[in-house]
């Protein structure tokens, strides 16, 4: 069997609320860290979420 290209990552809120999303990314196609503006329900605003490893 071939090795999978996709890895699971955690998108952590930069508002320091502890809220995070879990998503997948293609590790070979996107070598940099992902950064999105998504909704954080703790602060009830759209904030920047940055990629972190799932431990």
From Swiss-Prot:
HAMAP family in the record: Ribosomal_bL33
Highest taxon of the lineage: Bacteria
Single GO MF descriptor: structural constituent of ribosome
GO BP, sorted A to Z: translation
Family per record: Belongs to the bacterial ribosomal protein bL33 family.
Cellular component, GO, one term: cytosolic large ribosomal subunit
Protein's name according to its UniProt entry: Large ribosomal subunit protein bL33
Keywords attached to this entry: Ribonucleoprotein, Ribosomal protein
């Amino acid at each position: 069997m071939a090795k999978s290209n996709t890895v699971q990552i955690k998108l952590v809120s930069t508002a320091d609320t502890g809220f995070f999303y879990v998503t997948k990314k293609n590790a070979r196609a996107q070598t940099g860290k992902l950064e999105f503006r998504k909704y954080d329900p703790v602060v009830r605003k759209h904030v920047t979420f940055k990629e972190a490893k799932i431990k």
